[in-house]
Design a protein with these regions (language model features):
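Surface-exposed alpha-helical segments enriched in charged/polar residues
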Residues: 54-57, 61, 79, 83-86, ...
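Conserved GTP-binding G-domain of TRAFAC-class P-loop NTPases and closely related GTPase folds
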Residues: 1-8, 13, 17, 23-24, ...
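ATP-dependent NMP and nucleoside kinases share a basic, alpha-helical "lid"
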Residues: 34, 73-119
Length: 135
């Protein structure tokens, strides 16, 4: 049985850090860089998530476990995204959700520190409160 492991938590809660030693991983931030040239470009989320669905489905050809990194805090988008992966995939798979504790103050501090230190990450400070309410 195949296994899709997805992250769930607000921006800055540690999802990408947790995924660093996992393989293979599809992350929306990485796709924004690759496809749009800008980690902060959220103007084409449909395109980004459709590409993510396709890549995840394709990775199951070679791997039994595949990881997906994104906030996924909005349940309406989460369900439709997971359905799109299922629709594209020829394999049956189980979905495991890794829920990250979310503290807006901690996330804000982490993001500010990363940006100050020149770490490539989305400047998503303006979305934390909205994500936390959805979480």
């Amino acid at each position: 049985m195949k296994n899709l492991i997805i992250t769930l938590g607000i921006t800055g809660c540690g999802k990408s850090s947790w995924l660093k030693d996992k393989h293979p991983v599809v992350e929306t931030d990485d796709l924004r860089i690759e496809l749009l040239g800008n980690i902060d470009d959220i103007t084409q989320e449909g395109f980004i998530f459709k590409t993510a669905s396709k890549r995840l489905a394709e990775l199951f050809d070679s791997y039994d476990t595949v990881y997906f990194g994104a906030t996924m805090v909005d349940s309406n988008h989460r369900i439709s995204f997971l359905q799109s992966v299922k629709d594209m995939c020829v394999y049956s798979f189980v979905i495991d959700v890794v829920v990250f504790p979310s503290d807006p103050k901690v996330s804000i501090a982490r993001i500010k520190k990363d940006l100050k230190d020149g770490i490539l990450r989305a400047n998503s400070l303006q979305y934390i409160d909205q994500q936390y309410k959805q979480f």
